[in-house]
């Protein structure tokens, strides 16, 4: 590098205001001019190439040229001589010399495009296959003709390698090392970088990913100096760092999984269109399942100067008038042919064995059936067509029913506990888990390795618990898995002699661009609405490098919505295959699920679920289940194969709307749909009736019928007009003596004899005689005693009811016995003075209550919670007091409890906001959840924003435990330091002797604690007087 260039770089890095040298400026200007000239030359070559392909493109090019751009600068002055010549020449004929010069110019412009016959020398670590070399040559021809294209080979055919070979060709043959940008899904970032290093190490590839600080450092130290050829980054990074990427003149822009830009109004699509690029390449393994407008959006991104009007494109491909017409097919083929290359595995990769797919139909467990019934009954009015049918409501019902078919523990409160255990209940409460528990040991015994895909990450949580319980070595990847963990787990799974048996992935996050060909079994735990998602998941294993035949097991819960969802997805996939692979457009209306279809999917199997109460899970051997699944899969495949395109288009979900002939209402030549219309209750699903339980246990019946029961002892009579007194009303004890005397005398007058209580054993006779003696010796109340009784009846808390007493006890539990002010507020209908008076008597005489032990236990538990809240508040206060700006400075000592889900930034916010809102607030976790959603720092953090209040509470409890442990350690450390610093002779001899030989006095309990212990002790030794 020259001194001038060095000075320019240093000036840029130091952000100085000094001007760069004239040489650097002119060099930069030359590069800019060269880049602009190439774009203009490509445009010219592009038009020539397309017009030679077919005259169809004249339609678009003519339209794009209707509004020419206004020329810059002054108009060129026409010389008089030329003007006269133009006026005189009306025939516009060429001279022989002019024609010769034009032909010579065309010959010199025509050059032979380079083609590879074998794998290029710059490709290391292996040889490219013949179809991959053909793909490379096709992309080279696009480049030479200034055309951008779509590489749409089926998943697993090596699109990554073909793309790398194209960029290698540009460096080694065209002297264009870059800069190039490759934009890929986050899950495949590291895989792309690894592939660059493996196949073409001469290309210097760098990866832009990470948090703000990491990105800033990377941009300053790596990206801006430009010592690289290819920058690999993710969609999200393009959006966040768009201002940086706009500074570069990109030679090639490559987008993997290009369907992400099929909406031209999306943020990503708009930003990428602003990048300055010479060439663009789109990569997708998914067929073009686009409607007309989405197809235009892709073509507009590739060639904005050709396809610049969506309205013109829509008008030219008017599907309303010519869908299915041969003319439309011819047009579409002609338009797509120059830009699109798609090959299928069956056509080009003969060494890869075809995958074998099998559906395994499972039943519902008893718990699943119960939850399925609850969901249907909750919206039975909608299911029966009686309520307001809204699409969002139907979608929610479908989602809840799908959760039932996966596992009932996906519903909060379904799993038994606490305590929560990992046991057999994980298996026998779900039909799919029961099959999985039989299938996995068989696969492990066969030496297979397994990928399990599910749409629900919480289902992966359950599967993770199951793997822990069964001791299966596993990996897991979902949308929340950090980038570093993704790469590490993929490498661990793909290692030679890897101990990992299972890899659990979410269908959307784990189905894109990941190579897991070391596995040979794919289990689709729950099917996606979009069949292409499931195909992408299967192709993680079914790709180049796979040495075994890939087996795919799709788990389907029989006679539920899931069966219809899979059926619809298969019809959609087959129709797409007929249309798209034939080069035609998909009618977008067939992809939309209307309300009638959703309603009939929900209704499917509902009566069967209601009519049965028991489990459908069988104890059959796994081989028998697989054999039956294989037969049913073949039967359904044959039925679909027999349907033509017209039948597939009119395929219905057994709806009552206008449809074709393939509905199940067509039976034996009659349209039973018409008959059903005559019956107003034709679609009515009868909810299950409440049934009386009949006792059919014969042995138990006869044992009950023949048992000779002992007659119950007659109740002792009481005076008819005796007042009812309650123990919590705290009447004087003398009143109970007078009431007992009145009762005994009444029993004497009626001649009541006390029966022997056999339950008392040997003391029965003694107790009987004592009670009878009291009756025999009873005397009636005197006038003075009757007057005394009346006076005593007015001295108790007669206005206090059982409801008032329960409110008083709950208030003591909530606030503690010492907080009389708040206790008084919670007792409705009583003044503070009345509550204070009652409180004093209650704590003085509470031992007289019949269930004092239960009441005291209730109050003590509440006081324990209060003390716990105070200790937590104290711990949070201590932690926060150590920092001036805790929202930025606070650090947590995790030890071995870091966990993988929450980041330290999230934990810091939880702790600080919990302290700010107030830990002891009633709805603090709902407020915490709202604060997270309102915080700008989490606007892209979908994990923390999607947590429920209960999940936040659990996380905060964990963090509080860590803080308390940290506080204890700091206190112990401070005490130890103080002990070390204390001088040995600072304490007098007498006191030193006392402190060394005499134990420290025990701390005295609080008055309330002392009273509480006395109350319990007294209550345990006293018995309530029986009346």
Swiss-Prot record:
Biased composition (Basic residues): 69-78
Domain Helicase C-terminal: 435-586
PTM annotation (Phosphoserine): residues: 67
Pfam families: HAND, Helicase_C, SLIDE, SNF2-rel_dom
Localisation per UniProt entry: Nucleus
Biased segments, Low complexity type: 1-10, 984-999
MF (Gene Ontology): ATP binding; ATP hydrolysis activity; ATP-dependent activity, acting on DNA; ATP-dependent chromatin remodeler activity; chromatin binding; DNA binding; DNA-binding transcription factor binding; helicase activity
Helicase ATP-binding domain ranges (all copies): 140-305
Name the UniProt record assigns to this protein: Chromatin-remodeling complex ATPase chain Iswi
